[in-house]
Amino acid sequence: GNVEGWLAPGTYDVTEKATPKDLVKQMVSRTVTQLKDLKVPKEDYHAVLTKASIIEREVNDSRYYGQVARVIENRLAQTNGETHGLLQMDSTVQYGLGRFGGIPNSTELADSNNAYNTYVHQGLPPGPIGSPSEEAIKAVLNPPAGSWLYFVTVNLETGETLFSSTSEEQKANTKKLDEYCKKNEEICNGGKKKSG
């Protein structure tokens, strides 16, 4: 099966005789041990790793992990409200496109053929989009209380992220990202300058 999300980050002692398969087993075993130590029920492993991996790809600053975990929980719970159970996470769309970083364009955000497109598919994507740290996993297991439904990283270099509970607040915060992107086209477009 797919080992995405199951390969625990860290340092491993490997013998000369160890095969790649041995190393993968060691990495997966460390993840399972970590989940057991955190008392995660086995049936929740996949969802916890998926959520934690999204958190890490969405924000590059661990001080925001808990708030992003809360946004994910609030969005998943709100199937009839403002967000209709859609996570709407750029990181999942980018993963489905085989990219890391940047911001998906409107065509990519509307593409229902991308199974990881959480702008069009409700709930969690099919699986983890990276191998999360223990800190991100802990954020999923114990998110802070809050009514946030939205967040936007307004500076892709520093990771500064703003959270909001309404679409109106989010629109105001998104304008700050737009201003940043006008000044930093290459960063916002995944290393490519837009022509024209």
Functional labels for PLM-detected ranges:
Residues 1-196:
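Bacterial extracytoplasmic/cell-wall-associated proteins, especially those involved in peptidoglycan
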